[in-house]
Amino acid sequence: LTSGLVDQHFDRKARLGRLVRAMAATGQAHGFGIDEDTALEVRLGENSARVLGRGSVTLLDATHARYGFGSPALVADLEISVIAPGDRFRLSDLELLNTAGDATVGKEYFGDQPLQGGGMALANLRLDQSLGHDLLDNDASRVLKRYSIDEAGRVLVSRFTQTDRSAGYWRNEGARDHYTVTR
C-alpha cells in the first residue's frame, strides 16, 4: 500500500458518501473509514493492519469502480468490507487475514426478506449490522437497499449486492454482535 484516504467517526457521522466522493476526486483506489473509539494498527513491514477498539473499520476498494456524478450520481463496482475489532487484513489488496468470527455464508441465521428503506424505522442502522444481519447472514437476501433523503428531498440509494466473493463472519461479545463482512 503506497497511499489511501482515511476518514474518521465514519459510521456515527454517516461518512460513506463523503469518502467515496473524495476517492473519486483524488483517484485513490483505497479508502479507510474508521469508527469512533477505534484505531487501525498498521504494520507496514508485515503488509497488514488490525482493528483496535470498540468499532469497525470500513474498507473501500475502488480498483474497478466506475463513477458518474451527474444527476443522479452513480458509483458502481465499488467493493466494500467492514472489519470488526481484533480482525486483521492485508494492506495491499484489503483481503481478510484472520477473524475471530464464525462464517455466515452457507449457514445463514436469518431467512426473512429484509425491509428495503432507510431511517430510524429500520433495525440494524449501523453499516456492519445492515450488511451482516440483512445481507450476508440472511439466505433470503442477495441485494440490500438503503435510502437517505436530505432536506431538499433528494434521495440517495445505496445498493449493496452479495457476490460469489462476499463473505461474512459473526461473533458475539456480551450483548453486542460483531460482523466482519468482505466484498
Regions found by a protein language model. Name each.
Residues 1-183:
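C-terminal and late-domain segments of enzyme folds
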